Amino acid sequence: MAGTDSPAAARFVYRCLLFAPAIVVGLLLPLTLPPIAAAQRHTASDNPSTYNIGGVLSNSESETYFHTIISHLNFDQQYVPRKVTYYDKTIRMDKNPIKTVFNVCDKLIENRVYAVVVSHEQTSGDLSPAAVSYTSGFYSIPVIGISSRDAAFSDKNIHVSFLRTVPPYYHQADVWLEMLSHFAYTKVIIIHSSDTDGRAILGRFQTTSQTYYDDVDVRATVELIVEFEPKLESFTEHLIDMKTAQSRVYLMYASTEDAQVIFRDAGEYNMTGEGHVWIVTEQALFANNTPDGVLGLQLEHAHSDKGHIRDSVYVLASAIKEMISNETIAEAPKDCGDSAVNWESGKRLFQYLKSRNITGETGQVAFDDNGDRIYAGYDVINIREHQKKHVVGKFSYDSMRAKMRMNINDSEIIWPGKQNRKPEGIMIPTHLKVLTIEEKPFVYVRRMGDDEFRCEPDERPCPLFNATDSTANEYCCRGYCIDLLIELSKRINFTYDLALSPDGQFGHYLLRNNSGAMTLRKEWTGLMGELVNERADMIVAPLTINPERAEYIEFSKPFKYQGITILEKKPSRSSTLVSFLQPFSNTLWILVMVSVHVVALVLYLLDRFSPFGRFKLSHSDSNEEKALNLSSAVWFAWGVLLNSGIGEGTPRSFSARVLGMVWAGFAMIIVASYTANLAAFLVLERPKTKLSGINDARLRNTMENLTCATVKGSSVDMYFRRQVELSNMYRTMEANNYATAEQAIQDVKKGKLMAFIWDSSRLEYEASKDCELVTAGELFGRSGYGVGLQKGSPWTDSVTLAILEFHESGFMEKLDKQWIFHGHVQQNCELFEKTPNTLGLKNMAGVFILVGVGIAGGVGLIIIEVIYKKHQVKKQKRLDIARHAADKWRGTIEKRKTIRASLAMQRQYNVGLNSTHPPGTISLAVDKRRYPRLGQRLGPERAWPGDAADVLRTRRPYELGKPGQSPKVMGATPAMLGRTRPQQNILPPRYSPGYTSDVSHLVV
């Protein structure tokens, strides 16, 4: 055992434990430890009530704190269920890993520990924690490390049940990516050792960057990878390769000893001074020769053993509590000598531990699939003079977004060379002064507020230097040209200072007197003047390439091809409250309204005078149906026109119904025409532009009511000067020219300027942004935008080649889509709009003729109906007269028969009463006082027997005979009785004696 204390023996044991843990534990332990009975298993309802938590700690202070935390845990109901108690079992970490293995078996596993918390001194190496992990993992007992950060513990094939509350060293690659994104560095050189941790951090960086840069605009690429063997003696050979690379940003993972060698040799090559950026891991920060300006990372709570002990205990308690509520926990193994023990509950407990996510003393505690701590916080350290470490930022957990966030105060960073300005991070042979000008969408300019100290990530500072004032006004610029400048600076490796045009002009040349002499000289203004007079190195702006400018400056190949076009405002169309009436002309609307009421009136008249306007079903007891009144006719006409349901008041006559069908057809055509024309007003295009293009006669011969203009001193202004055929037009528009394109566009929108002639790119952008604007005609004066440089500039070819590559790679097309077509809120409007013609009487005359034909047809039909009805009435009258005559004749015949029968019965009756006289000799007289009607017909004195027939017909059956005797017995037939008409009850006639012409007998 003594030999294992030497460094060589320790390395040997470490390799044995690393590659053959099963051999060491499986062969050594059974030979040295007595066999112990296998662990007993509990049923599903027998979860243990006591849980022993083991601790392999590095000092007595940690042991005491571990015991205290376990004691306090038992009173925390949030983590400990009822009737559950935790106990601590601790041992001291031994530097000898073999002794550590025996101690774990004898003092921890023997006491049935359910998990082990392990810590060790940072200077003692990771052999002893590895031994604890091997031994516990063999029996599936979870191990929680609070200080081990080597990458080897992430290998679950070896450390099957190990997790830790500290992140491994190679997780610092995640922080590197955040820092590179913050500083916008695009090329880096990675320096790492060839051990497990060094290669792990390289792999982590490469793997994470593939997904990380999907969410950010700035992508960092690894230009060079430098790998070295640990225990360096010299790093000079690698520095030579690094010096020839373009990147000046170095990401280094090295131990403290190796970092000292690297910093020493880099200082000799002047690679730790101005313009270089060093970002290192924690170990390198502790080198005694770390250069000023180096940025490094330091894990928060890295040396807080108490905080990690507490977090590990509470993570374990949280996992056990959830496991108790979900499943049965078998007792922990107790025998290190039984290699057949398979504690499934330990494997399940390890899974529960990995799923924990709690807020502890060391921050947000959570684990990845390898059991490594995630959401660990880091301090960003800046090395100052005399090796002072200054915190300039933090990488911490954002609980609102549930992810990590980088926050760095750039103003507090001292960069290598004691510079306050952030290095560009690449090799820059020349620093250029670049000028630009505000021109949407190529350059947007925003003035910085008083409380702003830097521009937005997509902006670049572009101060405006006034010739009359030494101070600069701070502005921020972004846009098409700014992105082009950024990409150019990356591609051909130059840095720049960006500024705005001093006078806000592109520039044109003027003839000026030379010091009061008679000679004149040409002098350029604006951007051109700055470049010609060598006060600027480059112009990156929508600068049109033309012969006048090309004579004095160099142009690159065009980065944007365009031409000249005309911008005008579309004819406005007012919208009123009666806009819905626009599909029809006023005349047509009036005719439709009149037609509705005329048709209603005609329907009423047809139904009123039609003989069939009212009818009644045969054999029906219901009253006859009412005819269509005027109100119902109007309702019917409007209902048909507006396609509403007609529930009542419909025409009854055939003539009116024919008109109703014709009216329905008219309404269908009117409504369909109105609907179609209304849709045309809503969705079809407006009228075309007023101008057809530059060759429009109204432009060539400008009228007073048509004003056009451009920007004075611009390339368009020069184009009109060169074109002889446009000289007349130019003389007219010269007085109207504007100082800037922005002013002219605003006047076009207000209607003060009819036509603005300018570059097509800008005008198409404005037209696509505002539907009230439109470009007229085809392009003319085709040219392009180029990057301007000084005459003979060595950068011309490099810029030209870079722009050609941008065209081939699609970068320029990307800028077009981003800034010209999609750089603003697009309006869904077309280039032109057409207004449909308003429908008039001429268009709809056929419909009204159809209505007239319907009305005439209805009138004709009613005339035919009236004539036919008259003929029918005459025929019916003749039939009624004949029927009446026949009925009267029949009645007379029946009356006579009745009288004769009555007389015969009376005679028979009288014979029965007065047998002295025969029936034929007896005469009857009726008292007219009792029967006044008979008296009137017989005269003032007597009523004759024949005139009593009416009275006899009215007599009841019992009056014609004896009581109870039917009329048949008395000689009266049922037919005779049936022809009697109803009369009032009258008394039977009283016959009194009277005289006749024959006085031979007495009349009673």
Curated annotation (Swiss-Prot):
Binding site for glycine: 542-544, 549, 715, 759
Function: NMDA receptor subtype of glutamate-gated ion channels with high calcium permeability and voltage-dependent sensitivity to magnesium. Mediated by glycine. This protein plays a key role in synaptic plasticity, synaptogenesis, excitotoxicity, memory acquisition and learning. It mediates neuronal functions in glutamate neurotransmission. Is involved in the cell surface targeting of NMDA receptors. Plays a role in associative learning and in long-term memory consolidation.
Source organism of the structure: Drosophila persimilis
Signal peptide: 1-39
Family: Belongs to the glutamate-gated ion channel (TC 1.A.10.1) family.
TM region positions: 586-606, 664-684, 844-864
Annotated stretches, region: Disordered: 980-1004
Name used for this protein in its record: Glutamate [NMDA] receptor subunit 1
